[in-house]
């Protein structure tokens, strides 16, 4: 007699967790604050200098620090309690942003302050991403991640617009002070709304120079075939967000103005915001894993259709369909969490996020330069084509990862639970400690994943809602 399957997790279940509600609200405040600061500083620098180049440099200063933060600061969230890291990052950012509002601060100092404030976003995000599996175990984590990803996307779109409106209504310095208050509120929510947890890594993990620790993090992410494939699948977003980078020239070639540009941007944001929660709610964990590669390729193939030079209405459909296919990023995120050991997770997340931000900025610049030579539609189609080809290659790589490993003699490995793992262990990525190979001929190396299993047999991870 078999036990009845556990009911599927719901968004109501996710929001019923007080710690997640506090974390989610802090995400809204932090993301909105980041957008507001970028807009306010860009406006302030331009008002001071009347230089478009310096204004662009000031805006770019909000992205470049992710390189330093991702490589050298993200592992703080492994070596220190993650709640403490988040609260500290919010406090530091509040002070730095408030300092920007001081009258008479030189332009160079403003850019440096923004650079420093944004640099602390990386350890904050690494800590937030790493603590979430402990708050939302099993399949609840996938739903919670969908909520947070959608929130970030919405905050990016509305935050920039709200930032412009705030600067117009209140002025630059009051807007910066509002931004500082959002970070204070975020820190209070996390400090009061989440419980204390010890550091994930042992004290000895902090030994070594920052360069040595960064190199170890890169080896962790790119030395493992599964992690390497997952990170590259995540980085494919660089090709698929090109329409956002050249939305204005694309709309102009269609005879549209600011309204058409806004529609292009809104279509991608809205489609992603709708598709991601639906993908997490109605597609099973195992199916998500198998759909990652095909959906990534479908996103690129869809964008290739812009080579046909469609009108605005058809273009919006194309961009929406491509963005909806990008919901596969949720599966990438969840599989990444399962694969990375908990005591290295924050550093791994920092490196993965750093790559996305840096590559996306470079892709926007390259797409803009290419659009000076060929039509924007051709640039988008080329980016989609390249992304589709890479996605197909990564799909085959992922299938090799998913294939069951064979023991000597050709027999598939058999994994069984040695005992029921606690829910928090299941979510921490260390559940392999509770699994053993009953064939005993060969042991797999410690990987922190239950992805390798014999055909037709669910692992204990899958039975608990994790991929």
For the regions a language model picked out, list residue spans one by one.
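Long, low-complexity, intrinsically disordered segments
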Residues: 221, 431-467
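Alpha-helical transmembrane-bundle signature of multi-pass membrane transport and export proteins
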Residues: 1-438, 465
